[in-house]
Structures are given as C-alpha cells and as structure tokens.
Regions:
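Alpha-helical transmembrane segments and their helix-helix packing motifs
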Residues: 2-267
Length: 268
C-alpha cells in the first residue's frame, strides 16, 4: 500500500514568470533604458515609431474595406494594428508608451527622475521621426491609392476623428490606452518564448484599438498621414478634416502623451 504522506507529487513548472519576477525584470529593463547612449536610444526609438506606423498602415488599409459591420471591423482592425507592438517587443525597439513603466525603476530608486525624463524625451522624439519617415515612404509608394483610393479616404477619416474630440476626452482616452499597453508589455515580459509574448499582447492591444483609445505614437503616424492625404485632396467630405494641420496634430499629441504618461505612474 502506498503511503500518500511519503509520496512526492511533482507539479509542472509555470510557463510564465510570476508577478514579482515580472516587476524585477521591468526594473532591470528600466535601468537599462535609462543608461542607453542617446544616439542608440534615438535609433531604437525611430525603429519603434516605424514599427507602430506599420501597424497603423495595416489598420487603415483594412478599414478601407467597409463590407464588415462596425464592431467586427474594429476588432479585426485592432488585431491588424498588433503588428506594430509585436515588432517592437520582439525586435527590442524603444517605445515611448511602453517606457512609462520606467517608473518601476524610479520607485525603487535605481534611476533618477532626470534620467527617466531624459530617456522619455529622446524616445518620444525618436518615435515621431520614425513615424514620419514611414509617412514619407507610404506616400512615395502610393499605398494610399489602393482599393480605388479608398485607403486614402480611410487615412483621412481615422485622423479627422482624432482631432475633432476635446482635449480632456483625448487625455482620458490616453490613460485608458496605456492601461492596455502597460498590461500588454507586462504580459509580454512574463512570456518565456516568442509565441508566449506575441499571443499575450494580442488581446490588450486589439482591445484598445477597437475601443478608439489614444496612443500618442500611433497618432504620430495617423495624424500626419491623414494631413498629407487631405492636402492631396482626399477626404474633402470627411467631417473635421480641415483640422488636420500642425495645430490639430499638436492639440491631439499633447493630450494623448500626457494621458499615456499618467497611467505609467499610476500603474506603480
């Protein structure tokens, strides 16, 4: 007869990191980010801006097909946008919204406030430059002409919808957005394989896109792209398209950026 008390039960090892280990890993990542040379951080940030722009392009190309219902279109479009964060996470680029989690390292006093703010500024600017570069490439490649130029109208429509909302609403949508982004990064950090990381981030990112929340780096692509298309004569009948100018872009990005930052602080 087997003595149950003496038997050894072996439990499978968890296939992801525990929350405490995720926090520790996030702190280490924050220290690494804070100590990156400016040139390297800027280059990695440009890559991240470009990657998010690729996700934004995929999203607007998909939205140009109106055969799906509104809800299905938003959900599938959100999954298309996931391309951007998957590339950022797997390739190791520097994304401003994800870097809001550097406050974990600040909280544990492993970096200073000046280091964190400096890293944020460098990455924010780098993200913007990378996104603008993709705007240029998309324009020169004539991608907007696809689907009988419906893609161009989709670009204007998406952008116009972001500059016709009041500042406070954009700010709170930015907070909601980065709740999901921080959760996606947190889940991605927990994963031990590339598949774990990719699968883990899909739903949080698809959810924030489907809900229409405001991601400042995504808007660094959406807004200039929409403005360029409107200047080329597309989307003339889209409500609010006339606000697609430098002032409108600055208005949106200021609110979205501050909202995205706030949730990183609150997360800790």
């Amino acid at each position: 007869m087997i003595d149950i008390a003496d038997s050894k039960v072996e439990y499978p090892a968890p296939d992801c990191l525990a929350p405490a280990a995720i926090e520790a890993k996030t702190e280490v990542a924050g220290v690494t980010k804070a100590n990156l040379p400016v040139a390297k951080a800027f280059l990695l940030a440009m890559f991240a801006g470009a990657f998010i722009a690729f996700g934004g392009l995929f999203f607007t190309v998909f939205l140009s097909d109106s055969t799906l219902g509104w809800g299905a279109q938003r959900v599938v479009g959100g999954l298309c946008f996931c391309l951007g964060l998957v590339l950022v996470l797997v390739c190791g680029a520097e994304l401003f919204t994800g870097n809001s989690l550097m406050v974990c390292a600040l909280k544990s006093k492993k970096i200073t406030l000046v280091q964190m703010l400096k890293a944020w500024v460098v990455v924010w600017v780098g993200n913007f430059v990378g996104a603008l570069f993709i705007v240029f490439l998309v324009y020169m490649a004539g991608i907007y002409k696809l689907n009988g130029e419906a893609v161009a109208n989709s670009m204007v429509s998406v952008a116009a919808g972001k500059v016709t909302v009041d500042w406070v609403t954009i700010f709170f949508r930015g907070i909601l957005c980065n709740i999901f982004v921080c959760l996606a990064v947190w889940i991605g950090t927990a994963g031990k394989t590339v598949v774990d990381k990719v699968v883990g981030i899909l739903l949080p990112i698809a959810a924030f896109v489907a809900c229409g929340f405001e991601h400042c780096v995504a808007n660094m692509y959406f807004l200039p792209m929409g403005a360029v298309m409107h200047a080329c004569g597309y989307g003339a009948d889209v409500a609010g398209a006339d606000a697609l100018n430098a002032a409108g872009i600055a208005f949106n990005l200021s609110a979205a950026t501050l909202g995205n930052i706030e949730i990183g602080r609150a997360h800790v």
